[in-house]
Amino acid sequence: MSIDTQAIIKKYQSKTGDTGSSNVQIALLTARIKHLTEHFKTHKKDHHSRRGLLHLVSQRKKLLIYLKDANTASYSNLIIHLGLRK
């Protein structure tokens, strides 16, 4: 299972060439988190990667807080599309 970053960027970008907006970054982090979660189902003792997962979750949380303050409508829409909790 690999992550199709170009498809995620195209889906969540606000304009052509937009790869760094909060929406795109959060969507990419969510895909990486889901990928690592599947990895841990078979590799239970991979503690080194688990530390990286916690870092990704923390980074996504910070971006979600920023997006919620900056653009509430975009935040609500993104939460629904990605299936995240508030």
Curated annotation (Swiss-Prot):
InterPro entries registered for this protein in UniProt: Ribosomal_uS15 (IPR000589), Ribosomal_uS15_bac-type (IPR005290), uS15_NS1_RNA-bd_sf (IPR009068)
Keywords: Ribonucleoprotein, Ribosomal protein, RNA-binding, rRNA-binding
Pfam families, per database record: Ribosomal_S15
Cellular-component GO terms for this entry: cytosolic small ribosomal subunit
GO molecular function, one term: structural constituent of ribosome
BP GO terms, sorted: translation
Disulfide bonds: none
Subunit structure, interactors included: Part of the 30S ribosomal subunit. Forms a bridge to the 50S subunit in the 70S ribosome, contacting the 23S rRNA.
Family to which this protein belongs: Belongs to the universal ribosomal protein uS15 family.
Described function: One of the primary rRNA binding proteins, it binds directly to 16S rRNA where it helps nucleate assembly of the platform of the 30S subunit by binding and bridging several RNA helices of the 16S rRNA. Forms an intersubunit bridge (bridge B4) with the 23S rRNA of the 50S subunit in the ribosome.
Protein name: Small ribosomal subunit protein uS15
Native source organism of the sequence: Ruthia magnifica subsp. Calyptogena magnifica
Organism lineage: Bacteria, Pseudomonadati, Pseudomonadota, Gammaproteobacteria, Candidatus Pseudothioglobaceae
Underlying gene: rpsO
